[in-house]
From Swiss-Prot:
Transmembrane segments: none annotated. GO terms for biological process: thiamine biosynthetic process; thiamine diphosphate biosynthetic process. This is Hydroxyethylthiazole kinase 1. The keyword Magnesium applies. ATP binds at R115, T160. Catalyzes the phosphorylation of the hydroxyl group of 4-methyl-5-beta-hydroxyethylthiazole (THZ). The gene is thiM1. The keyword Thylakoid does not apply. SUPFAM superfamilies: Ribokinase-like. Substrate binds at M39, G187. Belongs to the Thz kinase family.
Length: 260
């Protein structure tokens, strides 16, 4: 069974502790894809929900001291119930505080994967690239950045940009699909973190396969959305992207995938 079919069959509960700007978009995107999102932010509630969850997303976009404590509590509970947790270290290269939080979560808690743009992941491993907060483009060595992070942290890494790279156990693949409209809609990267959290726990020992499918589904859905009437406009693209996540099939992935 393909990873996409498995996701739709299991409809995993995915707990999303994400930033305030993107909660609605993230929830709708996961529902369209076939997962079951919950945007819980209270430790006692997390204790109840994570027992049944298939994944946890920690997105540090809306960062406060209290949220830092929440991330820590959620990761402790996730480890207790063996729930795979994905970290999206939003803008961790933009300042010392964000970097400190990201380093703490990576070094002191169990993570199943890290998803970030080239600038974010590069900052975690001490590689200099040109980036601006949550935006990163035109990076040529994205596969090297992914491999460096995978080697340093010994967990799967997803690095996004004009080309995306996935590194698992020292092996790297690059994804050459995607839409230029994605950076023009706030929250597309954050939703991707939740999609990664939806796929990462589907098949133990098959993380590279699951992550490759997650990236292909996401990026090809973006291509489909851009090709639709007025898909070149951000407002229309946002709606059509959700529609494409709902409609995309394994046949679409097989026909349009560009992987190296």
């Amino acid at each position: 069974m393909t990873s996409l079919k498995l996701l739709k069959k299991k409809a995993p509960l995915v707990i999303c502790i994400t930033n305030d700007v993107v909660k609605n978009f993230t929830a709708n995107g996961l529902v369209a894809l076939g997962a079951s999102p919950a945007m819980s932010e209270f430790p006692a509630d997390l204790e109840d929900l994570l027992k049944y969850a298939g994944g946890l997303l920690i997105n540090i976009g809306t960062l406060t001291d209290e949220n830092w404590k929440l991330y820590q509590a959620a990761l402790k509970i996730a480890e207790k119930y063996n729930v795979p947790a994905v970290l999206d270290p939003v803008a961790c290269g933009a300042g010392e505080y964000r970097k400190k939080v990201a380093d703490d979560l990576i070094n002191n808690y169990k993570l199943a994967a890290i998803r970030g743009n080239a600038g974010e992941i590069a900052s975690l491993v001490g590689i200099d690239v040109a980036s601006k907060g949550v935006d990163s483009a035109g990076v040529d060595n994205i596969d090297e950045i992914a491999l460096a992070a995978n080697e340093k942290f010994n967990i799967p890494i997803v690095v996004t940009g004009e080309v995306d790279a996935i590194a698992v156990n020292g092996e790297v693949v690059t994804i050459h699909n995607g839409s230029a409209m994605m950076p023009k809609v706030i929250g597309t990267g954050c939703l991707l973190g939740a999609v990664v959290a939806s796929f990462i726990g589907l098949e133990k020992g098959q993380e590279l396969k699951s992550l490759e499918t997650a990236m292909l589904v996401y990026n090809i859905a973006g291509e489909m959305a851009e090709k639709r009437p007025n898909g070149h406009l951000p407002g229309t693209f946002k709606v059509e992207f959700i529609n494409a996540l709902y409609e995309i099939t394994d046949e679409d992935v097989k026909e349009f995938k560009r992987v190296k």
